[in-house]
Amino acid sequence: MKLTIATRKSKLAQVQTELIINVLKDKYGISSEKLLMETLGDKILDKSLADIGGKGLFIKDIERILLEDKADAAVHSMKDVPFEVPDMFEIAAVTLRVDVRDVFVSRDGTHFKDLKNGAVIGTSSNRRAAQLKMLRDDIKVVPIRGNVQTRIRKMGEEKLDGIILAAAGLKRLNMENIITDYFSVEEMIPAVGQGALGVEIKKENKNRDLFRKLDNKNSRMCVEAERSFMRTLNGDCHSTIGAYAEIVNGQMNVLGFYEIDGRRVKKDVSGNIEDYMSLGKTLAEKILEDK
């Protein structure tokens, strides 16, 4: 048996898919090949993601391939997966999460705290831009789209003082050496699902049980708590929303960030792990009540 795993064409997407392929081979002796896709979100880089499709922009084209049985599964960054997965699909596995933090990459090595007044930082994430303003109101934020390598190139070409990226992606690309500063999860609450990979399949997939074996229970619960938070706020991966759930001593702690009507609100809740879905919802309601 040889499986076909669909993913985006970017180097990071391929590296992430190879992680899944290697587990399938090493643990279960099953070979797989990649099917590379260029999604609409990859093709159009001169517009914001919100302007060209909104929810699920990086996912829909790949789901079509699954529907046509041209691939057995797809690997996504969980932060790109909308909270509503179409009925014919399921996220069979959420992998063990890696570093969830956002990082600052400086063009000239200057640390974030030492940036000059009015420094220009690139990010197309509303979530990152809003939290940057909470840390340093003087900073000017400009949009920057593309894969990791493209953003780094644009930083130099456009003479930006720095850019904000996800630690997980840089580490998976073995590019940790370019990181200037790490933001704590309190300073910059991550995107929902950041640092975790998701394996998506058709529900009637004959290899469903195999793919489900790749699931990490704790990562799944944390990511689902965050997605419950996003669902309650009716957000997507372009909304000004961040959430981070972690399990500490048998308890789940959830941090949430939301910008509403120009106000930026951060809150947290804690509770039993078994209540992970309701914790995300409770946190969202707590934020909405903060008027």
From Swiss-Prot:
Residues bearing the modification S-(dipyrrolylmethanemethyl)cysteine? 237
Catalyzed reactions per annotation: 4 porphobilinogen + H2O = hydroxymethylbilane + 4 NH4(+)
Q: Is Transferase among the key words of this record? A: yes
**Pfam families according to UniProt:** Porphobil_deam, Porphobil_deamC
EC number from the UniProt entry: 2.5.1.61
Q: Name one GO biological process term.
A: protoporphyrinogen IX biosynthetic process
Per the record, the domain of life is: Bacteria
Kindly state what the record says about how the cofactor is bound: Binds 1 dipyrromethane group covalently.
- SUPFAM superfamilies, alphabetized: Periplasmic binding protein-like II, Porphobilinogen deaminase (hydroxymethylbilane synthase), C-terminal domain
GO MF, one term, reads: hydroxymethylbilane synthase activity
Q: Name one GO cellular component term.
A: cytoplasm
Name the pathway it acts in.
Porphyrin-containing compound metabolism; protoporphyrin-IX biosynthesis; coproporphyrinogen-III from 5-aminolevulinate: step 2/4
Could you list this entry's UniProt keywords, alphabetically sorted: Porphyrin biosynthesis, Transferase
Does the keyword field hold GTP-binding?
no
Say which enzyme class the record assigns.
transferase
Which coenzyme or cofactor does it need? dipyrromethane
* HAMAP family referenced in this protein's UniProt entry, alphabetically: Porphobil_deam (MF_00260)
Subunit structure, interactors included: Monomer.
Job description of the protein = Tetrapolymerization of the monopyrrole PBG into the hydroxymethylbilane pre-uroporphyrinogen in several discrete steps.
Q: What else is known?
A: The porphobilinogen subunits are added to the dipyrromethane group.
Q: What is this protein called?
A: Porphobilinogen deaminase
* Organism in which the protein naturally occurs: Clostridium acetobutylicum (strain ATCC 824 / DSM 792 / JCM 1419 / IAM 19013 / LMG 5710 / NBRC 13948 / NRRL B-527 / VKM B-1787 / 2291 / W)
Identify the gene encoding this protein: hemC
